[in-house]
Design a protein with these regions (language model features):
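Active-site loop immediately N-terminal to the catalytic Tyr-X3-Lys motif
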Residues: 14-20
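C-terminal helical subdomain
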Residues: 49-50, 69-116
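Conserved SDR Rossmann-fold cofactor-binding beta-strand/turn motif
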Residues: 46-56
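Catalytic tyrosine of NAD(P)H-dependent dehydrogenase/reductases that use a Tyr as the general acid/base
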Residues: 22, 30
């Protein structure tokens, strides 16, 4: 028995301009998760995926090649998820009773409808 939890993204569901490679890799994570679930079922190994939306990390700074001003603008006008929010969701998935399996969990901040739509005040 065991549990594998892969981290995907909302970008595997809703692609965004300039995110072709990122979205493709997250789609691959989703396919791997589903395939492993089938392959490992008889061994009582759970395989789950969590797909976070916008999380305030260094992701945007890396995406904009160190341009902190551009990166900070991504998160202006709304409260994105924190790494702690995602960790809480991971813990929730991992702590379910043995007979309960969460295959896929989508988590976003309240202001985010999908990868392309975020309400900013």
């Amino acid at each position: 028995s065991g549990h594998i939890i892969n981290v995907s993204s909302t970008a595997d569901r809703d692609m965004y301009l300039g995110g072709n490679v990122y979205s493709a890799t997250k789609c691959a994570v989703d396919a791997l998760t589903k395939s492993l679930r089938l392959d490992l079922l008889e061994h009582n190994i759970k395989v789950s995926s969590i797909a976070p939306g916008m999380v305030h990390t260094e992701f945007s700074e890396v995406r904009f090649h160190g341009n902190k001003e551009l990166a900070d603008n991504v998160y202006k006008g709304f409260e994105p998820l924190s790494a702690h929010d995602v960790a809480d969701a991971l813990l929730y998935i991992a702590s379910r009773p043995a007979h309960v399996h969460i295959g896929d969990l989508l988590i976003t901040c309240t202001a985010q409808a999908n990868s392309n739509v975020v309400y900013k005040s």
